[in-house]
């Protein structure tokens, strides 16, 4: 009888411990929803449903490493950084594009993407790419709010938006398309300094509009080392030596410094807001300088085609791809691979965790 009681007691304790451990491992989302704005680094497929858009990733080899091995509009071989962040925060594994026709109510409640490949803060940027400019993405957001209210009611909808994490990833297109490679804006802004200030002013107006619509927790991505993008090595005839365009990297650093200074100023003027600068420059540069640390063998060209020019409609199912997708920093001549996005996502997640402590 004594043995029987001991066994029963032991089973009870074991069951209790398993139950406690299960509860401990069930992490609640840190934010009720995630809302994504920006360009192709964040577009999870909106351009698929926007007929005017020039840049689309609705064909292989884009998406080749996603479940089902099918392209769905993401400019990479797999997940984007927004998907990685959403997963790390326990919100959901994939953030759907708002323009997707069959988007579910549950996806509306937990957040969607409004980004458009080819977009920038400067409306001029979208003229050639026919993308949805960052300045027009709040129009989609307003439609989203209306649908969200129809699902959960006005009060709950605003509660979700107030507490959601807003992620903004844009900027490189403005400088690459309008200042470096097609210098349209140089006529009005002869120096990079003036154009940087113009772009930041546009960013300022954009985040203030999001705030007026209820957004409070806003993460703003800085610029990567633009001079190291394969497309820029091609544009500046650096492909043979593989040397980054140092001046463009210096421009990225200066812009980021200005952004770091500006965000606290914006936050101070918007009661209840909380801004986070997402540093992408340093981790990407570290991947370039220390590739073996991340398992990369190639950091100067993309996996698709030659790696120096192909992107969007130039990177197709007819393009040869590198044998090992995960050993390339870049998937095409502009966009990082899923492997790189995972490292970046982990880096930014650590920033978010520290941000939440403040």
Swiss-Prot record:
Enzyme Commission number(s) from the entry: 3.1.1.-
Span of the signal peptide: 1-22
GO biological processes: lipid catabolic process
Localization terms from the record: Secreted
Top-level taxon of origin: Eukaryota
Residues the record marks as carrying a glycan: 25, 102, 324
Active site positions: 40, 332, 335
Keywords: Glycoprotein, Hydrolase, Lipid degradation, Lipid metabolism, Secreted, Signal
GO molecular function terms listed in the Swiss-Prot or TrEMBL record: hydrolase activity, acting on ester bonds
CDD domains: SGNH_plant_lipase_like
Family note: Belongs to the 'GDSL' lipolytic enzyme family.
The protein, known as: GDSL esterase/lipase At2g30220
